[in-house]
Amino acid sequence: MSNAGGSSWEGMNPDVVEAQARILQGLSQEITALMNKIEGETSQLADAWHGDDSNKFAAEWAGTHKPVFTTAATLLQNMSDTSARNAGQQRSTSSG
């Protein structure tokens, strides 16, 4: 079986997969932090902007954009968790 690099081996390098899991976790945390920053900025706008356009803007953030950030962060965290779990299983299998 060939992998993306063209070599023909099967298995996993758990060190690399665990490193990738940490990167994915960090990206999830960065997205969450960015989402929280945008949430704060949106809240501050509500103090300086009133009316229908302001309400529409806030509703669009809360109903459309924020859920996308939440989903992206969750998916990255799930990928991180799966990668870390698979690396742990590989270590157990290889050492057993």
Kindly give the residue locations of the regions a language model identified.
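N-terminal secretion-targeting helices of virulence/extracellular proteins
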Residues: M1-G96
